[in-house]
Amino acid sequence: QQASCVLKLVKDGRQAELQFTLGNDADVDQQRLAEAIGQLRQTLPLLEADPYLQLNDSAWQSHSVQDQTLPEIDQVLAQIELGAGGLDLVGIYAAGPICRGFASSFGAFGWHQANSFNFDWSLFHSNGQAVKANYAGQQWNSDAFALRLRQAREQLEYLGRPLKTLAPGEYRAYLAPAAIDEIMGMLCWGGFSAQSLATKNSPLQRLYAGDARLNPLVSIAEQVSGSLSPAFSDEGTPRSDLRLIEQGQGLDRLICARSAAEFELTANGADGHESPCALSLAAGDLEQSDILARLGTGLYISNLWYLNF
């Protein structure tokens, strides 16, 4: 179990912040809190005023508890052992609640708690190559996990076949969800950030400027509702769902309080780094069983590594 606390002290346009780890001893934690506040009070007068400091002074309230029942660890391990019989499997399973809280002297208070699990594993072939797979969510489904493990087992068999060298050229390709996730993660490096867009540093600059567009089937949202992410930012601003890309066109952008002050915008609950916390890509209509038939002689790309700009 891990817990940490972030304290921020603000006065006369100045702000100071301190983060420290909490333990299981209330008396010790209270002493750490008192010492942290004292340190912040000494530091604050020494700092320069922040011209883009913007505080949310509303007394908003937010409370969400997603208390889904997670399976017992023995049950999970038994199913993994049953499904992985005869396989060289190495993985990490993590499960439990994730909690986030916020409180301000203006009277704002937010609490978010959600249970989730994540099983990340690799299946190794005798030739040293491996298939990486993952199963995560908030409700464990034995049938869904068995299917995911069976798919990984089938992919493992292909690693034993002779390698095929591809000549440079254009190929019809299918990108599996794990590969798309890598691309989406790279786009989060300032892609939807109001600050990056305002300073012309966003990888999606042409999209948001209207000079380019994606396929109309592409819609991406910041889907905070029902997600593992809280409905409030670390800056104390309530957040809601945003339509970042709708039918291939750039729409909403992530705006933190600082960017709102600097570029005369309205903050919409983004954290200071302005990266998505609950990115959701709209689903298509291609069934899993139809992928290879639709792909034909094209390339099936299960994952991507080391992406960069």
Please name every model-derived segment.
Residues 1-230, 237-240, 246-249, 277:
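Active-site bordering "gate/hinge" segments
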